[in-house]
Amino acid sequence: MPSFDSKAFLKSVTHQPGVYRMYNAEADVIYVGKAKDLKKRLSSYFRSNVPSEKTKALVSHIHQVDVTVTHSETEALILEHNYIKQYLPKYNVLLRDDKSYPYIFISQHKHPRISIHRGVKRKKGEYFGPYPDSGAVRESLHLIQKLFPIRQCEDSVYANRHRPCLMHQIGRCLAPCVKGIVSDEEYKEQTDFIRLFLQGKDRQVIQTLVKQMESASQSLNFEKAAIIRDQIQAMRRVQEQQYVSDDSGDDLDVLGFAIENGLACVHLLMIRQGKILGSRSFFPKIPANTDKEEVFLSFLTQYYLNHTQGRTIPNRVVTSFEFNSEDLERALTELSGRKVIFQLNPKGIKGRYLKLADTNALTALTSKSNHKLTMYQRFKQLEEALVLSSIQRMECFDISHTMGEKTVASCVVFNQEGPVKSEYRRYNIAGITGGDDYAAMAQVLERRYSKQLDIDKIPDIIFIDGGKGQLNRAYEVISKHWEDWPKQPLLLGIAKGVTRKHGLETLVKISGEEFSMPSDSPALHLIQHIRDESHNHAIGGHRAQRAKVRKTSTLQNIDGVGPKRRQALLQYLGGLQELKSASVEEIAKVPGISHSLAEKIHDALKHG
Protein backbone atom coordinates (compact mmCIF):
# COMPACT_ATOMS: atom_id res chain seq x y z
CA MET A 1 0.00 0.00 0.00
CA PRO A 2 1.56 3.34 -1.05
CA SER A 3 2.56 5.75 1.67
CA PHE A 4 0.69 8.97 0.94
CA ASP A 5 0.71 11.59 3.69
CA SER A 6 -2.80 13.00 3.25
CA LYS A 7 -2.56 15.29 6.29
CA ALA A 8 0.56 17.04 5.03
CA PHE A 9 -0.96 17.30 1.54
CA LEU A 10 -4.28 18.79 2.72
CA LYS A 11 -2.49 21.56 4.66
CA SER A 12 -1.36 23.07 1.35
CA VAL A 13 -4.71 22.80 -0.47
CA THR A 14 -6.76 25.95 -1.11
CA HIS A 15 -10.53 26.48 -0.71
CA GLN A 16 -10.76 27.80 -4.30
CA PRO A 17 -12.40 25.94 -7.21
CA GLY A 18 -10.20 23.71 -9.33
CA VAL A 19 -9.29 20.28 -10.68
CA TYR A 20 -7.28 17.48 -9.05
CA ARG A 21 -5.40 14.52 -10.56
CA MET A 22 -4.65 11.41 -8.52
CA TYR A 23 -1.66 9.20 -9.42
CA ASN A 24 -0.71 5.64 -8.47
CA ALA A 25 2.80 4.34 -7.67
CA GLU A 26 3.56 3.94 -11.40
CA ALA A 27 2.78 7.66 -11.94
CA ASP A 28 -0.37 6.84 -13.94
CA VAL A 29 -3.33 9.19 -13.52
CA ILE A 30 -6.05 7.02 -11.96
CA TYR A 31 -8.70 9.66 -11.25
CA VAL A 32 -9.56 13.23 -12.27
CA GLY A 33 -12.11 15.32 -10.39
CA LYS A 34 -13.29 18.92 -9.96
CA ALA A 35 -14.54 20.86 -6.97
CA LYS A 36 -16.04 24.21 -5.98
CA ASP A 37 -13.91 23.96 -2.84
CA LEU A 38 -10.78 21.86 -3.41
CA LYS A 39 -9.86 21.51 0.28
CA LYS A 40 -13.34 20.40 1.31
CA ARG A 41 -13.67 17.94 -1.57
CA LEU A 42 -10.22 16.37 -1.23
CA SER A 43 -10.58 16.06 2.55
CA SER A 44 -13.65 13.86 2.01
CA TYR A 45 -11.47 11.15 0.41
CA PHE A 46 -9.33 10.66 3.51
CA ARG A 47 -11.95 10.38 6.25
CA SER A 48 -11.96 7.22 8.35
CA ASN A 49 -15.58 6.40 7.52
CA VAL A 50 -15.68 6.57 3.71
CA PRO A 51 -18.93 4.78 2.71
CA SER A 52 -18.12 4.12 -0.98
CA GLU A 53 -16.28 0.93 -1.94
CA LYS A 54 -15.07 2.65 -5.09
CA THR A 55 -13.56 5.53 -3.09
CA LYS A 56 -11.86 3.08 -0.71
CA ALA A 57 -10.28 1.25 -3.65
CA LEU A 58 -9.20 4.54 -5.23
CA VAL A 59 -7.64 5.92 -2.03
CA SER A 60 -5.70 2.70 -1.47
CA HIS A 61 -3.83 3.34 -4.75
CA ILE A 62 -3.14 7.08 -4.34
CA HIS A 63 0.56 7.90 -4.37
CA GLN A 64 0.41 11.56 -5.39
CA VAL A 65 -2.21 14.28 -6.00
CA ASP A 66 -1.76 17.32 -8.25
CA VAL A 67 -4.07 20.32 -7.95
CA THR A 68 -4.87 23.00 -10.55
CA VAL A 69 -6.72 26.09 -9.29
CA THR A 70 -9.19 27.68 -11.74
CA HIS A 71 -10.95 31.05 -11.90
CA SER A 72 -14.44 29.56 -11.99
CA GLU A 73 -16.44 26.36 -11.72
CA THR A 74 -17.08 26.43 -15.48
CA GLU A 75 -13.35 26.57 -16.15
CA ALA A 76 -12.88 23.65 -13.74
CA LEU A 77 -15.57 21.63 -15.53
CA ILE A 78 -13.89 22.14 -18.92
CA LEU A 79 -10.40 21.39 -17.57
CA GLU A 80 -11.68 18.22 -15.87
CA HIS A 81 -13.17 17.06 -19.18
CA ASN A 82 -9.90 17.73 -21.03
CA TYR A 83 -7.85 15.81 -18.45
CA ILE A 84 -10.23 12.83 -18.55
CA LYS A 85 -9.99 12.77 -22.33
CA GLN A 86 -6.18 13.01 -22.15
CA TYR A 87 -5.46 10.45 -19.42
CA LEU A 88 -8.46 8.03 -19.57
CA PRO A 89 -8.18 7.40 -15.80
CA LYS A 90 -9.07 3.97 -14.44
CA TYR A 91 -11.56 5.21 -11.82
CA ASN A 92 -13.40 7.75 -14.00
CA VAL A 93 -16.51 6.99 -16.03
CA LEU A 94 -15.35 7.12 -19.66
CA LEU A 95 -17.45 7.91 -22.71
CA ARG A 96 -15.96 5.71 -25.43
CA ASP A 97 -17.05 7.73 -28.43
CA ASP A 98 -14.25 9.03 -30.66
CA LYS A 99 -16.26 9.32 -33.87
CA SER A 100 -16.96 12.77 -35.26
CA TYR A 101 -20.60 13.49 -35.98
CA PRO A 102 -21.71 13.78 -39.62
CA TYR A 103 -23.20 16.85 -41.27
CA ILE A 104 -25.11 17.53 -44.47
CA PHE A 105 -22.92 19.78 -46.62
CA ILE A 106 -24.02 22.10 -49.45
CA SER A 107 -20.99 23.16 -51.47
CA GLN A 108 -20.19 26.71 -52.59
CA HIS A 109 -20.54 26.14 -56.34
CA LYS A 110 -22.45 27.54 -59.30
CA HIS A 111 -24.53 24.36 -59.13
CA PRO A 112 -24.09 23.27 -55.48
CA ARG A 113 -23.68 19.63 -54.52
CA ILE A 114 -25.26 18.08 -51.41
CA SER A 115 -23.28 15.41 -49.56
CA ILE A 116 -22.28 13.90 -46.21
CA HIS A 117 -19.36 15.52 -44.36
CA ARG A 118 -17.33 14.33 -41.37
CA GLY A 119 -14.37 15.91 -39.64
CA VAL A 120 -12.86 19.39 -39.90
CA LYS A 121 -14.95 21.96 -41.79
CA ARG A 122 -12.34 23.05 -44.32
CA LYS A 123 -14.49 23.20 -47.46
CA LYS A 124 -16.33 26.38 -48.35
CA GLY A 125 -20.07 25.92 -48.13
CA GLU A 126 -22.88 25.39 -45.63
CA TYR A 127 -23.02 22.70 -42.95
CA PHE A 128 -26.28 21.42 -41.45
CA GLY A 129 -26.33 19.16 -38.42
CA PRO A 130 -24.80 17.43 -36.67
CA TYR A 131 -26.70 14.16 -37.05
CA PRO A 132 -26.43 11.32 -34.51
CA ASP A 133 -25.03 8.84 -37.04
CA SER A 134 -24.24 8.41 -40.73
CA GLY A 135 -27.37 6.30 -41.21
CA ALA A 136 -29.53 9.27 -40.23
CA VAL A 137 -27.66 11.50 -42.71
CA ARG A 138 -27.99 9.00 -45.56
CA GLU A 139 -31.71 8.68 -44.85
CA SER A 140 -32.07 12.48 -44.91
CA LEU A 141 -30.10 12.76 -48.16
CA HIS A 142 -32.23 10.07 -49.77
CA LEU A 143 -35.33 11.97 -48.68
CA ILE A 144 -33.99 15.32 -49.89
CA GLN A 145 -33.13 13.84 -53.29
CA LYS A 146 -36.75 12.77 -53.69
CA LEU A 147 -38.06 16.20 -52.71
CA PHE A 148 -35.46 18.49 -54.30
CA PRO A 149 -33.51 16.98 -57.22
CA ILE A 150 -30.11 18.64 -56.92
CA ARG A 151 -26.88 16.81 -57.66
CA GLN A 152 -24.97 14.55 -55.27
CA CYS A 153 -22.17 13.61 -57.70
CA GLU A 154 -18.51 14.58 -57.19
CA ASP A 155 -17.32 17.80 -58.84
CA SER A 156 -14.96 15.80 -61.07
CA VAL A 157 -17.89 13.77 -62.45
CA TYR A 158 -20.04 16.89 -62.84
CA ALA A 159 -17.31 18.71 -64.79
CA ASN A 160 -16.79 15.90 -67.30
CA ARG A 161 -20.35 14.87 -68.17
CA HIS A 162 -21.81 15.50 -71.62
CA ARG A 163 -25.14 13.75 -71.18
CA PRO A 164 -27.50 13.24 -68.23
CA CYS A 165 -26.91 10.29 -65.92
CA LEU A 166 -29.42 7.75 -64.60
CA MET A 167 -30.31 9.98 -61.62
CA HIS A 168 -31.81 12.53 -64.04
CA GLN A 169 -33.74 9.84 -65.89
CA ILE A 170 -35.46 8.71 -62.67
CA GLY A 171 -36.20 12.28 -61.57
CA ARG A 172 -33.61 12.55 -58.79
CA CYS A 173 -31.34 15.20 -60.39
CA LEU A 174 -31.99 18.25 -62.58
CA ALA A 175 -28.78 17.53 -64.57
CA PRO A 176 -27.11 20.96 -64.31
CA CYS A 177 -24.02 19.30 -65.82
CA VAL A 178 -25.63 19.41 -69.29
CA LYS A 179 -26.49 22.77 -70.84
CA GLY A 180 -30.09 23.50 -71.72
CA ILE A 181 -31.80 21.07 -69.35
CA VAL A 182 -32.28 23.33 -66.33
CA SER A 183 -31.70 27.05 -65.89
CA ASP A 184 -29.40 28.41 -63.20
CA GLU A 185 -32.41 30.15 -61.60
CA GLU A 186 -34.44 26.93 -61.37
CA TYR A 187 -31.51 25.05 -59.86
CA LYS A 188 -30.83 27.83 -57.36
CA GLU A 189 -34.47 27.79 -56.29
CA GLN A 190 -34.33 24.06 -55.48
CA THR A 191 -31.08 24.60 -53.55
CA ASP A 192 -32.73 27.41 -51.58
CA PHE A 193 -35.64 25.08 -50.80
CA ILE A 194 -33.18 22.56 -49.35
CA ARG A 195 -31.63 25.22 -47.11
CA LEU A 196 -35.06 26.20 -45.79
CA PHE A 197 -36.03 22.55 -45.34
CA LEU A 198 -32.87 21.81 -43.34
CA GLN A 199 -33.52 24.92 -41.23
CA GLY A 200 -36.97 23.55 -40.33
CA LYS A 201 -38.86 26.11 -42.47
CA ASP A 202 -41.00 23.55 -44.29
CA ARG A 203 -44.12 25.71 -44.24
CA GLN A 204 -42.32 28.52 -46.04
CA VAL A 205 -41.25 26.10 -48.79
CA ILE A 206 -44.78 24.70 -49.16
CA GLN A 207 -46.31 28.19 -49.31
CA THR A 208 -43.93 29.13 -52.12
CA LEU A 209 -44.67 25.91 -54.01
CA VAL A 210 -48.44 26.38 -53.65
CA LYS A 211 -48.17 29.85 -55.21
CA GLN A 212 -46.09 28.41 -58.07
CA MET A 213 -48.61 25.61 -58.63
CA GLU A 214 -51.52 28.07 -58.77
CA SER A 215 -49.58 30.30 -61.16
CA ALA A 216 -48.78 27.35 -63.44
CA SER A 217 -52.45 26.27 -63.45
CA GLN A 218 -53.64 29.77 -64.35
CA SER A 219 -51.12 29.81 -67.20
CA LEU A 220 -52.55 26.45 -68.37
CA ASN A 221 -49.16 24.80 -67.75
CA PHE A 222 -50.78 21.75 -66.19
CA GLU A 223 -47.72 19.51 -66.55
CA LYS A 224 -45.61 21.85 -64.42
CA ALA A 225 -48.49 22.27 -61.95
CA ALA A 226 -48.72 18.49 -61.55
CA ILE A 227 -44.97 18.21 -60.85
CA ILE A 228 -45.19 20.93 -58.18
CA ARG A 229 -48.31 19.29 -56.70
CA ASP A 230 -46.42 15.99 -56.31
CA GLN A 231 -43.55 17.85 -54.63
CA ILE A 232 -45.97 19.49 -52.17
CA GLN A 233 -47.62 16.17 -51.34
CA ALA A 234 -44.23 14.52 -50.76
CA MET A 235 -43.21 17.33 -48.40
CA ARG A 236 -46.44 17.04 -46.42
CA ARG A 237 -45.90 13.30 -45.98
CA VAL A 238 -42.42 14.03 -44.63
CA GLN A 239 -43.83 16.63 -42.24
CA GLU A 240 -46.23 14.06 -40.80
CA GLN A 241 -43.37 11.60 -40.19
CA GLN A 242 -40.94 14.07 -38.61
CA TYR A 243 -43.21 16.53 -36.78
CA VAL A 244 -42.62 16.66 -33.02
CA SER A 245 -43.14 20.13 -31.58
CA ASP A 246 -45.43 23.10 -32.07
CA ASP A 247 -42.32 25.28 -31.86
CA SER A 248 -40.52 24.96 -35.21
CA GLY A 249 -37.33 26.27 -33.59
CA ASP A 250 -37.33 23.71 -30.80
CA ASP A 251 -33.83 22.19 -30.39
CA LEU A 252 -33.70 19.51 -27.73
CA ASP A 253 -32.02 16.25 -26.80
CA VAL A 254 -34.11 13.58 -25.12
CA LEU A 255 -31.96 11.29 -22.97
CA GLY A 256 -33.08 7.87 -21.81
CA PHE A 257 -30.96 6.25 -19.09
CA ALA A 258 -30.65 2.69 -17.81
CA ILE A 259 -28.04 1.10 -15.54
CA GLU A 260 -27.80 -2.50 -14.33
CA ASN A 261 -25.12 -4.97 -13.23
CA GLY A 262 -22.17 -2.68 -13.96
CA LEU A 263 -23.44 -1.68 -17.42
CA ALA A 264 -25.05 1.64 -18.36
CA CYS A 265 -26.76 2.94 -21.48
CA VAL A 266 -27.71 6.49 -22.42
CA HIS A 267 -30.05 6.64 -25.41
CA LEU A 268 -30.01 9.99 -27.23
CA LEU A 269 -33.00 11.13 -29.29
CA MET A 270 -31.88 14.22 -31.21
CA ILE A 271 -34.54 16.77 -32.20
CA ARG A 272 -33.65 19.93 -34.13
CA GLN A 273 -36.04 22.62 -35.40
CA GLY A 274 -38.86 20.44 -34.11
CA LYS A 275 -37.84 17.39 -36.19
CA ILE A 276 -36.34 14.07 -35.16
CA LEU A 277 -32.89 13.73 -36.74
CA GLY A 278 -32.23 10.26 -35.34
CA SER A 279 -31.07 8.42 -32.24
CA ARG A 280 -28.01 6.69 -30.83
CA SER A 281 -27.11 4.55 -27.81
CA PHE A 282 -23.97 5.12 -25.72
CA PHE A 283 -22.37 2.67 -23.29
CA PRO A 284 -19.94 4.51 -20.95
CA LYS A 285 -17.14 2.50 -19.35
CA ILE A 286 -17.92 2.35 -15.62
CA PRO A 287 -15.49 1.57 -12.77
CA ALA A 288 -16.88 -0.86 -10.18
CA ASN A 289 -19.21 0.55 -7.50
CA THR A 290 -19.83 3.86 -9.28
CA ASP A 291 -23.12 5.50 -8.30
CA LYS A 292 -25.79 6.35 -10.89
CA GLU A 293 -25.52 10.12 -10.61
CA GLU A 294 -21.77 10.09 -11.28
CA VAL A 295 -22.31 7.88 -14.34
CA PHE A 296 -25.01 10.12 -15.79
CA LEU A 297 -23.30 13.42 -14.96
CA SER A 298 -19.97 12.15 -16.34
CA PHE A 299 -21.68 11.21 -19.59
CA LEU A 300 -23.33 14.62 -19.91
CA THR A 301 -20.10 16.48 -19.21
CA GLN A 302 -17.97 14.47 -21.62
CA TYR A 303 -20.64 14.41 -24.33
CA TYR A 304 -21.56 18.10 -24.40
CA LEU A 305 -18.08 19.50 -23.80
CA ASN A 306 -16.53 17.43 -26.60
CA HIS A 307 -16.58 20.17 -29.24
CA THR A 308 -13.91 18.44 -31.36
CA GLN A 309 -16.56 15.90 -32.43
CA GLY A 310 -18.72 18.67 -33.90
CA ARG A 311 -21.59 18.39 -31.45
CA THR A 312 -24.07 21.16 -30.85
CA ILE A 313 -25.53 22.13 -27.51
CA PRO A 314 -29.36 22.22 -27.67
CA ASN A 315 -31.54 24.74 -25.85
CA ARG A 316 -33.09 22.01 -23.75
CA VAL A 317 -32.08 18.55 -22.50
CA VAL A 318 -34.96 16.32 -21.40
CA THR A 319 -34.40 13.43 -18.98
CA SER A 320 -36.19 11.33 -16.38
CA PHE A 321 -33.08 10.96 -14.19
CA GLU A 322 -32.95 13.47 -11.35
CA PHE A 323 -29.52 14.96 -10.61
CA ASN A 324 -27.91 18.26 -9.64
CA SER A 325 -27.73 20.05 -12.99
CA GLU A 326 -26.91 23.61 -11.85
CA ASP A 327 -23.16 23.57 -12.55
CA LEU A 328 -23.54 21.94 -15.96
CA GLU A 329 -26.43 24.24 -16.95
CA ARG A 330 -24.29 27.25 -16.03
CA ALA A 331 -21.28 25.94 -17.98
CA LEU A 332 -23.28 25.05 -21.11
CA THR A 333 -25.10 28.40 -21.01
CA GLU A 334 -21.76 30.20 -20.79
CA LEU A 335 -20.22 28.12 -23.60
CA SER A 336 -23.17 28.38 -26.01
CA GLY A 337 -23.99 32.02 -25.29
CA ARG A 338 -27.69 31.22 -24.70
CA LYS A 339 -29.81 29.75 -21.95
CA VAL A 340 -29.53 25.94 -21.70
CA ILE A 341 -31.86 24.10 -19.34
CA PHE A 342 -32.32 20.51 -18.17
CA GLN A 343 -35.98 19.52 -17.99
CA LEU A 344 -37.08 16.65 -15.76
CA ASN A 345 -40.06 14.45 -16.69
CA PRO A 346 -42.04 16.85 -18.94
CA LYS A 347 -45.65 16.18 -19.92
CA GLY A 348 -47.22 15.96 -23.37
CA ILE A 349 -45.35 14.99 -26.51
CA LYS A 350 -41.92 15.56 -24.93
CA GLY A 351 -42.93 13.17 -22.16
CA ARG A 352 -43.91 10.52 -24.72
CA TYR A 353 -40.55 10.83 -26.45
CA LEU A 354 -38.80 10.63 -23.08
CA LYS A 355 -40.63 7.39 -22.34
CA LEU A 356 -39.55 6.08 -25.75
CA ALA A 357 -35.91 7.06 -25.06
CA ASP A 358 -35.98 5.32 -21.65
CA THR A 359 -37.46 2.19 -23.24
CA ASN A 360 -34.80 2.21 -25.95
CA ALA A 361 -32.05 2.64 -23.35
CA LEU A 362 -33.29 -0.37 -21.40
CA THR A 363 -33.70 -2.47 -24.57
CA ALA A 364 -30.19 -1.58 -25.76
CA LEU A 365 -28.76 -2.30 -22.31
CA THR A 366 -30.45 -5.72 -22.21
CA SER A 367 -29.11 -6.54 -25.66
CA LYS A 368 -25.61 -5.41 -24.67
CA SER A 369 -25.77 -7.42 -21.45
CA ASN A 370 -26.86 -10.56 -23.31
CA HIS A 371 -24.08 -10.08 -25.86
CA LYS A 372 -21.52 -9.57 -23.09
CA LEU A 373 -22.74 -12.69 -21.29
CA THR A 374 -22.60 -14.72 -24.52
CA MET A 375 -19.09 -13.46 -25.25
CA TYR A 376 -17.98 -14.20 -21.69
CA GLN A 377 -19.38 -17.74 -21.93
CA ARG A 378 -17.60 -18.29 -25.24
CA PHE A 379 -14.30 -17.12 -23.75
CA LYS A 380 -14.75 -19.49 -20.80
CA GLN A 381 -15.54 -22.39 -23.15
CA LEU A 382 -12.43 -21.59 -25.20
CA GLU A 383 -10.29 -21.46 -22.03
CA GLU A 384 -11.55 -24.94 -21.11
CA ALA A 385 -11.09 -26.35 -24.62
CA LEU A 386 -7.50 -25.07 -24.88
CA VAL A 387 -6.66 -25.66 -21.19
CA LEU A 388 -5.74 -22.01 -20.56
CA SER A 389 -6.14 -20.31 -17.19
CA SER A 390 -7.29 -17.02 -18.71
CA ILE A 391 -7.84 -15.42 -22.13
CA GLN A 392 -7.96 -11.62 -22.06
CA ARG A 393 -6.88 -10.73 -25.58
CA MET A 394 -6.75 -12.50 -28.96
CA GLU A 395 -5.47 -11.42 -32.36
CA CYS A 396 -6.11 -12.98 -35.76
CA PHE A 397 -4.35 -12.47 -39.11
CA ASP A 398 -5.50 -13.06 -42.68
CA ILE A 399 -4.21 -12.30 -46.19
CA SER A 400 -6.28 -11.17 -49.19
CA HIS A 401 -5.31 -10.68 -52.85
CA THR A 402 -6.47 -11.43 -56.38
CA MET A 403 -4.00 -13.52 -58.37
CA GLY A 404 -1.20 -12.07 -56.24
CA GLU A 405 -2.10 -8.43 -56.90
CA LYS A 406 -2.79 -5.72 -54.30
CA THR A 407 -2.07 -7.98 -51.33
CA VAL A 408 -3.51 -6.74 -48.03
CA ALA A 409 -3.08 -8.31 -44.59
CA SER A 410 -5.42 -7.73 -41.68
CA CYS A 411 -5.12 -7.97 -37.91
CA VAL A 412 -8.23 -7.95 -35.74
CA VAL A 413 -8.36 -7.84 -31.94
CA PHE A 414 -10.88 -9.37 -29.52
CA ASN A 415 -11.18 -9.03 -25.76
CA GLN A 416 -13.79 -10.48 -23.41
CA GLU A 417 -16.33 -7.93 -24.60
CA GLY A 418 -15.87 -8.93 -28.25
CA PRO A 419 -14.28 -7.13 -31.21
CA VAL A 420 -12.07 -4.13 -30.36
CA LYS A 421 -12.56 -2.39 -33.70
CA SER A 422 -10.51 0.67 -32.75
CA GLU A 423 -7.45 -1.63 -32.75
CA TYR A 424 -8.11 -3.31 -36.11
CA ARG A 425 -5.25 -2.76 -38.56
CA ARG A 426 -4.61 -3.31 -42.27
CA TYR A 427 -1.18 -3.69 -43.84
CA ASN A 428 -0.43 -3.16 -47.52
CA ILE A 429 2.09 -5.85 -48.47
CA ALA A 430 4.92 -4.98 -50.87
CA GLY A 431 8.29 -6.38 -51.95
CA ILE A 432 7.21 -10.03 -52.21
CA THR A 433 6.47 -12.41 -55.07
CA GLY A 434 2.81 -12.08 -56.03
CA GLY A 435 0.69 -14.81 -54.47
CA ASP A 436 3.29 -15.82 -51.85
CA ASP A 437 1.00 -15.97 -48.82
CA TYR A 438 3.81 -17.23 -46.56
CA ALA A 439 5.94 -14.18 -47.33
CA ALA A 440 2.93 -11.89 -46.88
CA MET A 441 2.16 -13.42 -43.48
CA ALA A 442 5.80 -13.13 -42.43
CA GLN A 443 5.85 -9.45 -43.39
CA VAL A 444 2.71 -8.49 -41.49
CA LEU A 445 3.77 -10.37 -38.35
CA GLU A 446 7.22 -8.77 -38.46
CA ARG A 447 5.67 -5.33 -38.75
CA ARG A 448 3.19 -6.08 -35.97
CA TYR A 449 5.45 -7.64 -33.34
CA SER A 450 8.94 -6.26 -33.98
CA LYS A 451 8.05 -3.03 -32.17
CA GLN A 452 7.79 -2.68 -28.41
CA LEU A 453 4.39 -3.78 -27.09
CA ASP A 454 2.63 -2.64 -23.93
CA ILE A 455 2.14 -5.54 -21.53
CA ASP A 456 -1.64 -5.36 -21.83
CA LYS A 457 -1.37 -5.47 -25.64
CA ILE A 458 0.36 -8.86 -25.71
CA PRO A 459 -2.25 -11.39 -26.87
CA ASP A 460 -2.96 -14.67 -25.11
CA ILE A 461 -3.76 -16.33 -28.45
CA ILE A 462 -2.62 -15.49 -31.98
CA PHE A 463 -4.77 -17.07 -34.69
CA ILE A 464 -3.41 -17.54 -38.21
CA ASP A 465 -5.94 -18.13 -40.97
CA GLY A 466 -4.17 -21.06 -42.61
CA GLY A 467 -2.73 -24.52 -42.10
CA LYS A 468 0.62 -25.96 -40.99
CA GLY A 469 2.74 -24.05 -43.51
CA GLN A 470 1.35 -20.65 -42.56
CA LEU A 471 1.55 -21.49 -38.86
CA ASN A 472 5.20 -22.60 -39.05
CA ARG A 473 6.12 -19.41 -40.90
CA ALA A 474 4.29 -17.39 -38.26
CA TYR A 475 6.18 -19.19 -35.47
CA GLU A 476 9.55 -18.40 -37.12
CA VAL A 477 8.74 -14.69 -37.08
CA ILE A 478 6.95 -14.27 -33.74
CA SER A 479 9.27 -16.48 -31.68
CA LYS A 480 12.14 -14.06 -32.45
CA HIS A 481 10.33 -11.32 -30.55
CA TRP A 482 8.58 -12.97 -27.61
CA GLU A 483 11.72 -13.71 -25.55
CA ASP A 484 11.30 -10.38 -23.75
CA TRP A 485 7.56 -10.74 -23.31
CA PRO A 486 6.20 -11.65 -19.84
CA LYS A 487 4.11 -14.39 -21.48
CA GLN A 488 4.20 -16.40 -24.69
CA PRO A 489 0.96 -16.45 -26.65
CA LEU A 490 -0.56 -19.66 -27.95
CA LEU A 491 -0.24 -19.91 -31.74
CA LEU A 492 -3.11 -21.63 -33.56
CA GLY A 493 -3.77 -22.13 -37.25
CA ILE A 494 -7.35 -22.22 -38.54
CA ALA A 495 -7.47 -24.57 -41.51
CA LYS A 496 -10.64 -24.95 -43.55
CA GLY A 497 -10.54 -28.74 -43.49
CA VAL A 498 -11.02 -31.20 -46.34
CA THR A 499 -14.62 -30.27 -47.12
CA ARG A 500 -13.98 -26.50 -46.58
CA LYS A 501 -17.39 -26.22 -44.90
CA HIS A 502 -18.25 -23.73 -42.15
CA GLY A 503 -18.26 -25.56 -38.83
CA LEU A 504 -15.77 -28.21 -39.90
CA GLU A 505 -12.60 -26.17 -39.38
CA THR A 506 -9.40 -27.91 -38.29
CA LEU A 507 -7.27 -26.21 -35.64
CA VAL A 508 -3.51 -26.68 -35.86
CA LYS A 509 -0.98 -26.35 -33.03
CA ILE A 510 2.68 -25.46 -33.56
CA SER A 511 3.56 -29.05 -32.61
CA GLY A 512 1.70 -30.20 -35.72
CA GLU A 513 -1.19 -31.64 -33.72
CA GLU A 514 -4.56 -31.13 -35.37
CA PHE A 515 -7.92 -31.13 -33.62
CA SER A 516 -11.47 -29.95 -34.14
CA MET A 517 -14.43 -28.86 -32.03
CA PRO A 518 -18.12 -29.77 -32.25
CA SER A 519 -19.97 -27.54 -34.72
CA ASP A 520 -22.30 -26.31 -31.93
CA SER A 521 -19.44 -25.46 -29.56
CA PRO A 522 -19.50 -21.84 -28.26
CA ALA A 523 -15.68 -21.96 -28.29
CA LEU A 524 -15.71 -22.78 -32.02
CA HIS A 525 -18.23 -20.00 -32.65
CA LEU A 526 -15.81 -17.53 -31.04
CA ILE A 527 -12.96 -18.78 -33.24
CA GLN A 528 -15.17 -18.51 -36.33
CA HIS A 529 -16.17 -14.99 -35.30
CA ILE A 530 -12.61 -13.69 -35.01
CA ARG A 531 -11.57 -15.55 -38.19
CA ASP A 532 -14.50 -14.09 -40.16
CA GLU A 533 -13.78 -10.59 -38.83
CA SER A 534 -10.16 -10.88 -39.97
CA HIS A 535 -11.20 -12.27 -43.34
CA ASN A 536 -13.74 -9.49 -43.97
CA HIS A 537 -11.31 -6.81 -42.81
CA ALA A 538 -8.64 -8.08 -45.21
CA ILE A 539 -11.06 -8.33 -48.13
CA GLY A 540 -12.33 -4.81 -47.45
CA GLY A 541 -8.79 -3.43 -47.64
CA HIS A 542 -8.00 -5.43 -50.77
CA ARG A 543 -11.14 -4.24 -52.56
CA ALA A 544 -10.32 -0.65 -51.68
CA GLN A 545 -6.86 -1.07 -53.21
CA ARG A 546 -8.31 -2.63 -56.36
CA ALA A 547 -10.89 0.13 -56.69
CA LYS A 548 -8.12 2.74 -56.94
CA VAL A 549 -6.81 1.25 -60.18
CA ARG A 550 -10.08 -0.06 -61.60
CA LYS A 551 -10.88 3.02 -63.67
CA THR A 552 -7.79 2.83 -65.81
CA SER A 553 -6.75 -0.83 -65.59
CA THR A 554 -9.51 -1.97 -67.98
CA LEU A 555 -8.38 0.49 -70.65
CA GLN A 556 -4.65 -0.09 -70.13
CA ASN A 557 -4.82 -3.45 -71.91
CA ILE A 558 -6.26 -2.03 -75.16
CA ASP A 559 -3.70 -1.37 -77.91
CA GLY A 560 -3.84 2.19 -79.20
CA VAL A 561 -5.33 3.64 -76.01
CA GLY A 562 -2.66 5.60 -74.16
CA PRO A 563 -2.97 7.92 -71.16
CA LYS A 564 -4.33 10.88 -73.17
CA ARG A 565 -6.98 8.82 -74.94
CA ARG A 566 -7.96 7.11 -71.67
CA GLN A 567 -8.48 10.51 -70.10
CA ALA A 568 -10.45 11.77 -73.10
CA LEU A 569 -12.72 8.70 -73.07
CA LEU A 570 -13.48 8.97 -69.36
CA GLN A 571 -13.99 12.74 -69.43
CA TYR A 572 -16.16 12.84 -72.56
CA LEU A 573 -18.45 9.98 -71.55
CA GLY A 574 -18.45 10.74 -67.80
CA GLY A 575 -16.78 7.67 -66.31
CA LEU A 576 -15.97 4.00 -66.82
CA GLN A 577 -19.53 2.72 -66.30
CA GLU A 578 -20.88 5.16 -68.90
CA LEU A 579 -18.08 4.13 -71.29
CA LYS A 580 -18.97 0.45 -70.85
CA SER A 581 -22.62 1.14 -71.70
CA ALA A 582 -21.83 3.39 -74.69
CA SER A 583 -22.32 2.24 -78.30
CA VAL A 584 -19.55 2.18 -80.93
CA GLU A 585 -20.98 5.35 -82.51
CA GLU A 586 -20.96 7.20 -79.16
CA ILE A 587 -17.36 6.14 -78.46
CA ALA A 588 -16.31 7.27 -81.94
CA LYS A 589 -17.53 10.81 -81.14
CA VAL A 590 -14.76 11.19 -78.55
CA PRO A 591 -12.00 13.45 -79.95
CA GLY A 592 -9.03 11.36 -81.14
CA ILE A 593 -10.96 8.07 -81.37
CA SER A 594 -11.46 6.60 -84.84
CA HIS A 595 -14.38 4.32 -85.70
CA SER A 596 -12.13 1.26 -85.89
CA LEU A 597 -10.56 2.05 -82.51
CA ALA A 598 -14.04 2.63 -81.08
CA GLU A 599 -15.01 -0.87 -82.23
CA LYS A 600 -11.90 -2.31 -80.56
CA ILE A 601 -12.65 -0.44 -77.31
CA HIS A 602 -16.31 -1.49 -77.38
CA ASP A 603 -15.38 -5.14 -77.97
CA ALA A 604 -12.73 -5.12 -75.21
CA LEU A 605 -15.10 -3.63 -72.65
CA LYS A 606 -17.95 -5.97 -73.55
CA HIS A 607 -15.99 -9.21 -73.82
CA GLY A 608 -12.64 -8.50 -72.17
Swiss-Prot record:
* GO BP term, example: nucleotide-excision repair
Disulfide feature: none
Every UVR domain range: 203-238
Q: Which SUPFAM superfamilies match?
A: C-terminal UvrC-binding domain of UvrB, GIY-YIG endonuclease, RuvA domain 2-like
Q: Does the keyword DNA repair apply?
A: yes
Q: Offer an example of a GO molecular function term for this protein.
A: excinuclease ABC activity
Q: Which UniProt keywords apply?
A: Cytoplasm, DNA damage, DNA excision, DNA repair, Excision nuclease, SOS response
**Pfam families recorded for this chain?**
GIY-YIG (PF01541), HHH_5 (PF14520), UVR (PF02151), UvrC_RNaseH (PF22920), UvrC_RNaseH_dom (PF08459)
Localization per Swiss-Prot or TrEMBL: Cytoplasm
Subunit description: Interacts with UvrB in an incision complex.
Q: What is this protein called?
A: UvrABC system protein C
This protein's species is Aliivibrio fischeri (strain ATCC 700601 / ES114) (Vibrio fischeri)
